[in-house]
Amino acid sequence: MINANFLADTDPLVAEIIQKEYGRQQDHLELIASENFTSPAVMAAQGSVLTNKYAEGLPSKRYYGGCEFIDEVEQIAIDRAKQLFGAAHANVQPHAGAQANLAVFLTLLKPGDTIMGMDLSHGGHLTHGSPVNISGKWFKAHHYGVNKETEAIDYDQVLELAKKHKPKLLICGYSAYSQIINFEKFRAIADEVGAYLLADIAHIAGLVATGHHPNPVPHCDVVTTTTHKTLRGPRGGLILTRDSELGKKLDKSVFPGTQGGPLEHVIAAKAVAFGEALKPEFKTYSGQVIENAAALATQLQERKLKIVSGGTENHVMLVDLRSVSMTGKKADKLMSGVNITANKNTVPFDPESPFVTSGLRLGSPAMTSRGMKATEFIEIGDIIAERLQNPEDEGIAQKCRERVASLCKAFPLYPHMMAKVPSLV
């Protein structure tokens, strides 16, 4: 492989920025729920010579020559994905979760058809019918939300809305929802109104793969996911189905329907990540992700901060900052000031705009990857509460920074890279 000094010799400006980003990741508590730290093996595959190869088509059905080894690695990724999720068919080529969803829409829908997913402000996703996304521009989008009292999905309301709007595609799976999803109930609702059912499990895929969350594959027509987040792979997408014939149509919607050449270096990294996820250690990791999230949520509640829906059953939680008379925008800035990376987020029935919000989204996957356990997440919860409840006290801010620094030092990111190097790839 390429010597670590090569990038610094060729482009010292970019090398320096990469080094700075490594320093930022090392010195911050990463609590953005959609982020994680991949293994060095995943990064090595992604930085390999496979980036040089065009490979339009599928294994053994390529439009370019010289794909014999590309075919092998992509088939490994396909086989491992199918094994992980119990699927009959997998397409590992989508560049991202949004592209995976677009391919599903192209397969199952025509412009003007009706779709129904969760409202973005309640925890849904842009690609589930938001008016600013192609899914909301090409299709008639309707949305369901959570119950105002429980802040959890009201399946009776979903059924009522589905009967009213008669969607051709019903979507479940969310970007900021902390409770278990009942895919069996969604299947029953879809069947009652004659809809296809899509589960977008981008956030919970790693938990599903290890049995820590119910598997949607037996119940849904199609399942999409990203390959990073809780799955801890490279940034990319994945499509799964239990229907092999439908799988063939989905393949055509990926290529040539919505993409050209696949990113085979990323697919190799997906194969590595799927292999890691099949190991017992990854199941232990996923269980720890859930335990750590619960510890964080409980500590925040003990410090009198409100958690949407009363807690978390997965890796993510929303702090309703109206309990401390603060906006998400302000909280995001306060967290950044003590080297905690999180993101402002709308909460259900939020009176603030998406650019301001009343919530802060937190997640446990990344810092769990660095080896932290419940004890550390209790400490993190205490730091967060201390800062949010004393926003004007710079003395407390400094103490919070010191506590963050101590945690980061105790759980280094990529210890083999701790020495200052010009390139991390």
Swiss-Prot record:
Marked site: Plays an important role in substrate specificity: 228
One term under GO cellular component: cytosol
One of the record's GO molecular function terms: glycine hydroxymethyltransferase activity
Pfam families given in the database record: SHMT
PTM-bearing positions, type N6-(pyridoxal phosphate)lysine: 229
Keyword Amino-acid biosynthesis: yes
Catalytic activity: (6R)-5,10-methylene-5,6,7,8-tetrahydrofolate + glycine + H2O = (6S)-5,6,7,8-tetrahydrofolate + L-serine
Biological processes annotated in GO: glycine biosynthetic process from serine; tetrahydrofolate interconversion
Cofactors named for this entry: pyridoxal 5'-phosphate
Keywords: Amino-acid biosynthesis, Cytoplasm, One-carbon metabolism, Pyridoxal phosphate, Transferase
UniProt superkingdom: Bacteria
Pathway connected to this protein: One-carbon metabolism; tetrahydrofolate interconversion; Amino-acid biosynthesis; glycine biosynthesis; glycine from L-serine: step 1/1
Main subcellular localisation: cytoplasm
Subcellular locations according to the entry: Cytoplasm
HAMAP family, alphabetized: SHMT
Complex formation: Homodimer.
Task of the protein: Catalyzes the reversible interconversion of serine and glycine with tetrahydrofolate (THF) serving as the one-carbon carrier. This reaction serves as the major source of one-carbon groups required for the biosynthesis of purines, thymidylate, methionine, and other important biomolecules. Also exhibits THF-independent aldolase activity toward beta-hydroxyamino acids, producing glycine and aldehydes, via a retro-aldol mechanism.
Family in the record: Belongs to the SHMT family.
Stated name of the protein: Serine hydroxymethyltransferase
Species annotation: Trichodesmium erythraeum (strain IMS101)
Gene: glyA
